[in-house]
Regions:
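Sec-dependent signal peptide recognition
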Residues: 2-9
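C-terminal, helix-dominated tail/subdomain
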Residues: 455-488
Length: 619
């Protein structure tokens, strides 16, 4: 039985232990407002909707998203969209004292506090999963009647905003989808005036702003939609009405009762205390402080909880946070590493529930009768399904075909069973997908000159020639067959399909071949180039995320993997460096893995640093 042992995905997973002592607070905090969305605004999310807050004093911006809001269709890629923004404009000056902006990972609440003319101002931000809303609370502790500001809502595509009573609404249509978002302002004391494009608060003691939105996206529908604009309005309004009947105290209590038991399952204790300097100073000047490693690990878990709970879609290239309508690579679902990597920490970081959206996405699309994933396979006269590299939420798949991704996705379906031992899930959800995926490869594989079964005309993302028997494909198909046989054993399935699987598995090339300079070979015909610093480690799938290569199994292959990995070098983009960290850990080189981990903790500029500028849009 294969059980993944990764410790880095969205951020990093090192080694999680439960501690008897009082937990060290996990907080990102700063002494000034954010200036740039990508590098300094702070995220909140409930798995389906999310927001980024800047923490401005005279002006505040809350940019928000719904993970299902996409332009595009079943025939056009489109892109993930920015749903909109809330803009707060206060009657206070920009200068203040005691400024603090923080994100508490322990309770998933953002806070901004400062003092002006002896009055303390406090804001709290959170995204509630049980109530499906984003909440902003504004108070002046110890002072009454001091809140004076205007609130404006802006559609991410510059549509009209309707103001009705104390509610603001945006709505619109895209290629396939309709959408709506509402923001409700509730004031304690003072006055609220309704203007044509904003709400104005005067002399309030406290204010609660509740925000929510939805689209008519439905993954299971043949059209990928369910209901019209009126149905969306009813759904959003019902959600808002339910939240509006709760006090802020009850909304917050429900949020904490839902979130904290999940987050508190795991603690990484490296015997470090929370420092008294800001997080940017921690990263820039105190990287040897073990608190940074603790924070990095828990921030990864926080982001997973914020971008992948419930719903029909997994985390995308940016989780679910996006402030533009033309994001890099459309903020899509890349099948050659990115969407899979998002879920590497899920089980080992004890967030198994966060796997559900990815599993739903894969199983629904793979088994959709006549769906686009099945059509890709039919074009090659194969049963089952396959995908290309870039994928939107409507089944559209393009750029280069990535056949082995179907096997890769199935390793995740198996891993979820390996951790949960949920036999019902294995039988009803994972097994049907794994079976038809094997059938795809039954039809696709061919016999080589040595009598072994190989995948014809495959590549090694994202470089090199197309050849038969490329390591990337062979290692993944090997893992698929091995794990499907393990699933058959658990489910006591012994039929003609299993017999064929056993026969083909016995003849399958495992993709493990040692080359002329002692490396795991990437291709069978082309000689690997020593010193090739390609970001992908596709010829080392068997090392990580799969586990055919291990010092515990065969030292020769482990040593050859080490040679190949060392040849790739230590330079990398963020995701590639994470992969290298995991691989070096599998090779029992903790020093090298930790050195790369510390490199990953560098502050990134807006363009993603040197490698970010190199990795521009390809299509």
């Amino acid at each position: 039985m294969r059980v993944g042992k990764c410790f880095l995905g969205l951020a990093a997973c090192l080694y999680a232990v439960a501690a008897d002592a009082e937990r060290v607070p996990m907080k990102l905090w700063y002494d000034e407002p954010a200036k740039v969305w990508m590098t300094s605004a702070l995220p909140v999310g409930n798995g389906g909707i999310g927001a980024m807050f800047f923490g401005g004093v005279a002006k505040e911006q809350l940019q928000f998203n719904d993970k299902t809001l996409w332009a595009g269709s079943t025939t056009r890629r489109g892109a993930y969209q920015n749903m909109g923004d809330l803009f707060f404009e206060f009657d206070t000056p920009e200068t203040c004292t005691n400024y603090r902006r923080e994100l508490s990972l322990d309770d998933a609440i953002g806070r901004v506090s400062y003092t002006i003319d002896g009055v303390d101002y406090l804001r709290e931000y959170f995204a509630s999963n049980p109530d499906s809303v984003i909440v902003v609370r504004l108070t002046t502790p110890g002072h009454k009647g001091k809140l004076n500001f205007s609130l404006r809502m802006q559609d991410g595509r510059q549509g009209m905003t309707r103001v009705d009573g104390h509610t603001m609404t945006i709505k619109g249509t895209l290629d396939l989808l309709s959408y709506e978002a509402q923001a409700l302002l509730q004031a304690d004391g003072g006055m609220v005036e309704t203007k044509s494009d904003r709400l104005e608060v005067k002399g309030a003691d406290a204010v609660t702003v509740v925000l929510t939105g939805a689209t008519n996206f439905d993954l299971a529908s043949p059209t990928y939609t369910r209901g019209d604009a009126d149905e969306i309005h009813r759904r959003v309004s019902a959600r808002m009405d339910k939240a509006a009947r709760k006090s802020y105290k009850k909304l917050k209590a429900a949020h904490l009762a839902d979130y904290q038991p999940l987050f508190a399952r795991v603690e990484l204790d490296l015997d470090a205390e929370q420092p008294d300097y800001t997080t940017d100073v921690l990263v820039r000047e105190h990287k040897d402080n073990a608190y940074l490693d603790m924070l990095y690990f828990q921030y990864g878990r926080y982001l997973m909880l914020g971008s992948s709970r419930g719903g029909q879609l997994p985390s995308n290239l940016q989780g679910l946070w996006n402030n533009v309508n033309n994001p890099a690579w459309e903020c899509d679902y890349h099948s050659n590493i990115n969407v899979q990597m998002n879920y590497w920490p899920a089980e080992v970081a004890n967030l198994s529930e966060c796997y559900a959206p990815f599993i739903t996405y894969v199983s629904t699309e793979a088994l959709k009768d006549g769906g686009s994933w099945q059509q890709v396979a039919r074009k090659e006269n194969c049963r089952g399904w396959a995908v290309h590299t870039q994928n939107n939420i409507f089944g559209y798949t393009d750029w280069l075909i990535n056949r082995p991704a179907n096997a890769w996705y199935c390793t995740h379906l198996w891993q979820h069973y390996a951790y949960t031992l949920d036999k019902e899930y294995l039988r009803d959800t994972a097994w049907p997908v794994m079976k038809v995926t094997c059938q795809y490869w039954f039809d696709r594989l061919k016999e080589n000159a040595e009598g072994r079964l190989v995948a014809p005309n495959e590549w090694s993302p994202e470089h090199g020639p197309w050849e038969d028997g490329v390591a990337y494909a062979q290692q993944l198909v090997y893992a698929l067959f091995e794990e499907t046989l393990a699933a058959a054993d658990v489910l006591a399935v012994d039929d003609a399909f299993v017999s064929e699987l056993k026969e083909k598995f016995s003849r399958l090339d495992n993709g493990l071949h040692i080359g002329s300079w002692g490396q795991i070979k990437e291709w069978t015909i082309q000689e690997d180039k020593q010193g090739d610093h390609q970001r992908h480690l596709s010829h080392l799938m068997a090392l990580y995320p799969c586990d055919q290569i291990s010092y515990l199994k065969d030292k020769r292959y482990a040593e050859a993997a080490k040679v190949a990995l060392d040849s790739r070098g230590d330079g990398a983009t963020g995701w590639s460096r994470a992969w290298k960290v995991a691989c070096w850990a599998r090779l029992w080189d903790g020093e090298r893995a930790y050195r790369l981990l510390k490199q990953a903790q560098n502050i990134t500029d807006r363009d993603g640093g040197e490698h970010g500028r190199q990795c521009r849009r390809r299509v």
